[in-house]
């Protein structure tokens, strides 16, 4: 027997299907967790699994994460990059990984006391950094955000540092003295000192050694 649908009934059916699809989309904000420590990954999973609006996946290494990102297409990536802070040379693997993250909001955390900030420090428009001890606060905030608010995190590329601060920082990391940096950039010694002070204040560290530790990770972002 043929069932005749009124225009009102058909409209209700179509609208209900649209809302079901929207609800399905909202309930699947994707988060990728990367940490070699099984217990950390398990703890993050357990905490975030309390939220029905999140779809989680975890891997132990940056190398595995690179292929997972292409597959999973996460909107948020939470990654422990402490081991790469100890590598002062060029690291193609880390550089490639960070390039693959360009469509996600990335939170880098470190097994260190610094950065000395209770909230993530935005290095660029999409990448922030924090000390691991503040990871619980980050997870708490992530468990409350919706799919749409997650998308809003993706903003235009920006930098925490000015172009001249970048140049000063690069020379500083090579242990170049202030007078030589000043000569190269055609600025005064006092301006170099001022830039160094602003750099450490922005990244929330106390000295060159702490900055160098973090710099080994974020130098690939600029």
Model-derived regions, located:
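Hydrophobic residues on short alpha-helical segments
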Residues: 166-170, 200, 212
